[in-house]
């Protein structure tokens, strides 16, 4: 796309620049990839005006969906402490599994959103792991650990979510029994609402594909969650992602060709109009 842009417009003003950010640490903790490059750019005084992220945002056909934002993601671990004992003498123990049931029920049933955010799906808390004991059939375990993930909109912050969770749990676990709560942020929510980049993307898709794209903030997180902290105009547009993370991941060559044309048209609208 950039090659064709420069060939078609050799007199492109030199005040503009185009950079490629390609890293190999996008999955998992994602600590030594995009984050490090963005830190370097900030230290060098580099300013990012627009960022087009090539995530596979298309759902059924190329260009049918554009991600103009993403939900935030926070992982949490709750450890409920009871008292270990023999199952035949429950009065001498405190079963952390029993203690945890009302706590977990309160979490999964809680409506986190007081008002609907029209740009984001509802906040979702999903339990991802529950572990207690070592498999012994005659022992009441000493503790239970439950892990969860929350996907949230710009209506919330990690701090407000932790405060909400503690306000739910504190009344349910009193006396000598206690819980520990640890939360780790894996991404903050962002929203690009209007602006030159989003307008250029929507117009380019409509011109080349004869249909407007849908704007969405659903799905998982991407490196855009890091980039948006440095570049307020961050939007994602890419191929159809039906085979991503699968054996023989693939995309039609025609889609690749058309996507390059869309990217070129977007840059022309940004740089030349």
Model-derived regions: residue spans:
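Short, solvent-exposed loop/turn segments at secondary-structure boundaries
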Residues: 65, 90-92, 192-194, 247-250
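Midchain, well-structured core segments that form catalytic/ion-binding scaffolds
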Residues: 41-173, 182, 186-187
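Residues at alpha-helix caps and immediate loop-helix transition turns in enzyme cores, especially N-
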Residues: 30-34, 92, 157, 161, ...
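Zn-dependent metallopeptidase/amidohydrolase metal-coordination segment
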Residues: 202-204, 208-273
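Alpha-helical metal-binding/catalytic segments enriched in His/Glu/Asp
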Residues: 1-31, 74-80, 89-111, 148, ...
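Short, low-order "capping/linker" segments at domain edges
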Residues: 189-205
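Acidic/histidine-rich catalytic neighborhood of metal-dependent amide-processing enzymes
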Residues: 1-69
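Structural element of the ATP-grasp superfamily
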Residues: 78, 148, 201, 226-227
């Amino acid at each position: 796309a950039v090659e064709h842009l420069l060939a078609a417009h050799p007199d492109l003003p030199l005040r503009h620049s185009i950079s490629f950010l390609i890293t190999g640490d996008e999955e998992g903790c994602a600590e030594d990839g995009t984050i490090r490059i963005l830190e370097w750019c900030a230290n060098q005084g580099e300013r990012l005006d627009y960022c087009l992220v090539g995530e596979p945002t298309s759902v059924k056909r190329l260009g049918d969906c554009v991600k103009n934002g993403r939900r935030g993601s926070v992982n949490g671990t709750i450890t409920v402490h009871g008292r270990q004992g023999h199952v035949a003498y429950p009065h001498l123990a405190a079963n952390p599994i029993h203690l945890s049931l009302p706590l977990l029920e309160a979490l999964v049933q809680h409506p986190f959103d007081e008002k609907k955010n029209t740009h984001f799906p509802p906040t979702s808390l999903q339990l991802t792991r529950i572990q207690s004991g070592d498999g012994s059939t005659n022992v009441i375990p000493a503790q239970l650990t439950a892990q969860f993930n929350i996907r949230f909109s710009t209506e919330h912050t990690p701090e407000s979510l932790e405060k909400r969770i503690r306000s739910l749990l504190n009344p349910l676990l009193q006396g000598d029994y206690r819980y520990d709560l640890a939360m780790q942020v894996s991404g903050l929510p962002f929203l690009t609402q209007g602006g030159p980049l989003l307008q250029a993307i929507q117009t380019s898709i409509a011109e080349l594909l004869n249909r407007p794209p849908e704007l969405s903030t659903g799905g998982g997180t991407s490196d855009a969650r890091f980039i948006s902290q440095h570049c307020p105009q961050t939007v994602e547009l890419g191929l159809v992602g039906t085979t991503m993370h699968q054996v023989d991941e693939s995309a039609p060559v025609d889609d690749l060709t058309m996507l390059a044309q869309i990217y070129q048209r977007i840059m022309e609208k940004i740089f030349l109009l």
